[in-house]
A protein has these predicted regions:
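Catalytic cores of enzyme domains
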Residues: 3-178
């Protein structure tokens, strides 16, 4: 049976400077990235050959976007929910891409690692095969997604456990603006 849910969307506006002051701690979050299977295997994930702060400092505004998958039935199977989350991530990316196209000199920030290619070229030591699609996530650039979710959207991050999906999943990203 498919994951039974509905989608809620929320946005919040802040300055890039305020967001950095409150939520960006590159050195704090890098160890979490190092525990992930995408670390050093995707061009969108650390380690980088640049300082992530250069991206944050290149912009003045940030429109945060939360796409919430609210379960309609409690304790649904986690694997089914994760499959739905992957589908929603595609729709989420499409919206952020539209915002980026419509906003000159902006850069979208995605949720989680890039999934545009089945196998990232970084693994083979090659440049990104789709550089026009390469975008970083808030967390890859040292941002505290849980803290930002609580502060701007007044909701905690929930995690599945014991094979059961949480009451909701949230994809958090945004659009950096000049």
């Amino acid at each position: 049976m498919p994951f039974q849910y509905h989608v809620r969307e929320m946005t919040a506006e802040t300055s890039a400077e305020e967001f950095v002051t409150r939520f960006v701690r590159v050195e704090k979050f890098l160890p979490f990235c190092q525990q992930c299977g995408s670390y050093n295997t995707r061009w969108t994930c650390p380690p980088f050959d640049f300082d992530p702060m250069t991206i944050w400092r290149s912009y003045t505004g940030l429109r945060l976007y939360a796409r919430i998958l609210q379960a309609d039935v409690p304790e649904q199977p986690l694997d089914v929910a994760v499959a739905a989350l992957k589908q929603e991530k595609r729709l989420y990316r499409e919206l952020l891409q539209r915002w980026e196209r419509e906003t000159p000199e902006s850069q979208m920030l995605l949720a989680g690692t890039c999934d545009q290619c089945e196998t990232c070229e970084k693994v083979q030591g090659h440049p990104c095969g789709r550089p026009e699609l390469l975008r970083y996530s808030i967390e890859a650039l040292g941002g505290d997604v849980e803290g930002c979710l609580q502060h701007y959207f007044h909701m905690p991050m929930l995690w599945g456990r014991d094979g059961k999906a949480p009451d909701y999943f949230v994809l958090v990203g945004g659009l950096l603006t000049k």
